[in-house]
């Protein structure tokens, strides 16, 4: 039994030492009252992929500017140049690289109402696709101005949904109002991409 006494004493001493440290630490926190701070000698890395309202408004503005740019390019340089620009706009603004985009254009008709593919979106904007013979090119209608009036914006994490009116004016000054819903997703590079786009003409009784 004598062989175990030194080990017991060492264990007891270690326990007492640890307890003492714990007591000191607790006393230190207690003495500090409510003024408890956490510090670090290194800058803490933070990952924040939440979308801001300003990013949403900027993405909407960019869409409107792109539509006008396609129209003016068509008027000045023809369909080939307008189509090349439309392809760039779709690749830059929409999320087709992730998979199907929930795109329901204003003037699309059955059985090709929903344009879940890049090809379908391109056909709607600039036409010239035998798979979508009814498309004449919505973006080729000499649009000159786009005004966006949001009814509401719902932001949650890295997605944002908007609903409201978009007023598009052509070069003759004729304005067309559409009801529009967009949903944006912030990608791994911090860019907002459209993953839902529903557009329709206002109901008239």
Curated annotation (Swiss-Prot):
Activity is not affected by EDTA or 2,6-pyridinedicarboxylic acid (PDA). Activity is not affected by addition of most divalent metal ions, except zinc ions which decrease the activity. Inhibited by the iodide ion. Residues 1-24 form the signal peptide. It catalyses: hydrogencarbonate + H(+) = CO2 + H2O. Keywords: Lyase, Signal. One of its GO terms (molecular function) is lyase activity. Belongs to the iota-class carbonic anhydrase family. Catalyzes the hydration of carbon dioxide (CO2) to bicarbonate (HCO3(-)). Has only very low bicarbonate dehydration activity. May function even in metal-poor environments. This is Metal-independent carbonic anhydrase. It comes from Nostoc sp. (strain PCC 7120 / SAG 25.82 / UTEX 2576).
